[in-house]
């Protein structure tokens, strides 16, 4: 039972981490673009 719960939770965490990383990347890109436009 424990072995089945672990693999199921891992993919969910990976998906959430990937989403958070994507949001962070978008934020960084937005800041970079804004800085370029302001300059």
Curated annotation (Swiss-Prot):
<comment type="subunit">
    <text>PSII is composed of 1 copy each of membrane proteins PsbA, PsbB, PsbC, PsbD, PsbE, PsbF, PsbH, PsbI, PsbJ, PsbK, PsbL, PsbM, PsbT, PsbX, PsbY, PsbZ, Psb30/Ycf12, peripheral proteins PsbO, CyanoQ (PsbQ), PsbU, PsbV and a large number of cofactors. It forms dimeric complexes.</text>
</comment>
<dbReference type="GO" id="GO:0031676">
    <property type="term" value="C:plasma membrane-derived thylakoid membrane"/>
</dbReference>
<dbReference type="InterPro" id="IPR003372">
    <property type="entry name" value="PSII_PsbL"/>
</dbReference>
<comment type="function">
    <text>One of the components of the core complex of photosystem II (PSII). PSII is a light-driven water:plastoquinone oxidoreductase that uses light energy to abstract electrons from H(2)O, generating O(2) and a proton gradient subsequently used for ATP formation. It consists of a core antenna complex that captures photons, and an electron transfer chain that converts photonic excitation into a charge separation. This subunit is found at the monomer-monomer interface and is required for correct PSII assembly and/or dimerization.</text>
</comment>
<keyword id="KW-0793">Thylakoid</keyword>
<keyword id="KW-0472">Membrane</keyword>
<dbReference type="GO" id="GO:0009539">
    <property type="term" value="C:photosystem II reaction center"/>
</dbReference>
<keyword id="KW-1133">Transmembrane helix</keyword>
<dbReference type="GO" id="GO:0015979">
    <property type="term" value="P:photosynthesis"/>
</dbReference>
<keyword id="KW-0604">Photosystem II</keyword>
<keyword id="KW-0602">Photosynthesis</keyword>
<keyword id="KW-0674">Reaction center</keyword>
<keyword id="KW-0812">Transmembrane</keyword>
<dbReference type="Pfam" id="PF02419">
    <property type="entry name" value="PsbL"/>
</dbReference>
<comment type="similarity">
    <text>Belongs to the PsbL family.</text>
</comment>
<feature type="transmembrane region" description="Helical">
    <location>
        <begin position="18"/>
        <end position="38"/>
    </location>
</feature>
<protein>
    <recommendedName>
        <fullName>Photosystem II reaction center protein L</fullName>
    </recommendedName>
</protein>
<dbReference type="InterPro" id="IPR037266">
    <property type="entry name" value="PSII_PsbL_sf"/>
</dbReference>
